[in-house]
Amino acid sequence: MNWLTNVVRPKIRNMLRRETPENLWIKCPDSGQLVFYKDVEANQFVIPGSNYHMRMGAVARLKSIFDNETWYDVALPDVTPDPLKFRDEKKYVDRIKDARARTNLNDAIKVGYGKLEGAAVVIAVQDFDFMGGSLGMAAGEAIVRGLELAVEKKSPFIVFAASGGARMQEGILSLMQMPRTTVAVQMLREAKQPYIVVLTNPTTGGVTASYAMLGDVQIAEPGALIGFAGARVIEQTIREKLPEGFQRAEYLKEHGMVDMVVHRHDLRPTLARLCRLLTKAPALETASKSVQPVVSPAQIVSASETAPAAPHA
């Protein structure tokens, strides 16, 4: 009997076992329903039933905005990977390596240059999956370089913010990115180019205290958590109970902190319309989203290099 239970049965189970992908199903944080991952991915990571907006990676975000899902990656400057030789439970350099392997990104922000309904734009996207989208030297350089390119190309700059705040492993060098990015935003304003911010879930800490709240137009995704300090910290400090929905996108819109709350499916036409209005450009023919990209990899362009618009069929 032991031979049957200990040897034969496990072998049969192994023969019949099928490998199941870990992310085959997604549980909605709002309703608790299980949804097929492919359905959520096809729906721009919005849960079909509850309309809950899941976090969206940088590459997926750029694909959803640029014409024909095609753009040029903006080459970003290298920075010292671990200036403070920081270590907690794990070395900082090892954390960066793990984050790069997991996300296939160099750091928390990816910058692209391309066309949005025929008009040239520069877009920066923070990816929360890369160390919580934290603002460090590399992320600060990415924002500054993107703004410089927007000035050079005389095009709008759009940033999708998603961050837990400044990167503690870089100390004061991380906090220094707050004034640096603020100065760069002012440089774009002096060039009379639009600066549009899309606040996604979550946008907190030093990012909220710098470039994420300086937009000519402030847009938020539904249900996004937006604030500087956490609600619990605020309650403990002021010794008062905060109102329901405090720091959520809808609450901030009601109190004038953001201009509009836009569903993810409506973001692309909304951003295109705002860019046309703010640049006083005529309405252009909308590029078809059903057309497949004619180049597979995004090409590289530096901020000082003149790049053509993303190629189309």
UniProtKB/Swiss-Prot annotation:
<keyword id="KW-0067">ATP-binding</keyword>
<dbReference type="InterPro" id="IPR034733">
    <property type="entry name" value="AcCoA_carboxyl_beta"/>
</dbReference>
<dbReference type="Pfam" id="PF01039">
    <property type="entry name" value="Carboxyl_trans"/>
</dbReference>
<feature type="domain" description="CoA carboxyltransferase N-terminal">
    <location>
        <begin position="24"/>
        <end position="293"/>
    </location>
</feature>
<keyword id="KW-0963">Cytoplasm</keyword>
<keyword id="KW-0444">Lipid biosynthesis</keyword>
<dbReference type="InterPro" id="IPR011762">
    <property type="entry name" value="COA_CT_N"/>
</dbReference>
<dbReference type="InterPro" id="IPR029045">
    <property type="entry name" value="ClpP/crotonase-like_dom_sf"/>
</dbReference>
<comment type="subunit">
    <text>Acetyl-CoA carboxylase is a heterohexamer composed of biotin carboxyl carrier protein (AccB), biotin carboxylase (AccC) and two subunits each of ACCase subunit alpha (AccA) and ACCase subunit beta (AccD).</text>
</comment>
<keyword id="KW-0443">Lipid metabolism</keyword>
<dbReference type="GO" id="GO:0017148">
    <property type="term" value="P:negative regulation of translation"/>
</dbReference>
<comment type="function">
    <text>Component of the acetyl coenzyme A carboxylase (ACC) complex. Biotin carboxylase (BC) catalyzes the carboxylation of biotin on its carrier protein (BCCP) and then the CO(2) group is transferred by the transcarboxylase to acetyl-CoA to form malonyl-CoA.</text>
</comment>
<dbReference type="GO" id="GO:2001295">
    <property type="term" value="P:malonyl-CoA biosynthetic process"/>
</dbReference>
<keyword id="KW-0275">Fatty acid biosynthesis</keyword>
<keyword id="KW-0547">Nucleotide-binding</keyword>
<keyword id="KW-0808">Transferase</keyword>
<dbReference type="GO" id="GO:0005524">
    <property type="term" value="F:ATP binding"/>
</dbReference>
<keyword id="KW-0276">Fatty acid metabolism</keyword>
<dbReference type="GO" id="GO:0003989">
    <property type="term" value="F:acetyl-CoA carboxylase activity"/>
</dbReference>
<dbReference type="GO" id="GO:0009329">
    <property type="term" value="C:acetate CoA-transferase complex"/>
</dbReference>
<dbReference type="GO" id="GO:0006633">
    <property type="term" value="P:fatty acid biosynthetic process"/>
</dbReference>
<dbReference type="GO" id="GO:0016743">
    <property type="term" value="F:carboxyl- or carbamoyltransferase activity"/>
</dbReference>
<protein>
    <recommendedName>
        <fullName>Acetyl-coenzyme A carboxylase carboxyl transferase subunit beta</fullName>
        <ecNumber>2.1.3.15</ecNumber>
    </recommendedName>
</protein>
<comment type="similarity">
    <text>Belongs to the AccD/PCCB family.</text>
</comment>
<dbReference type="InterPro" id="IPR000438">
    <property type="entry name" value="Acetyl_CoA_COase_Trfase_b_su"/>
</dbReference>
<comment type="pathway">
    <text>Lipid metabolism; malonyl-CoA biosynthesis; malonyl-CoA from acetyl-CoA: step 1/1.</text>
</comment>
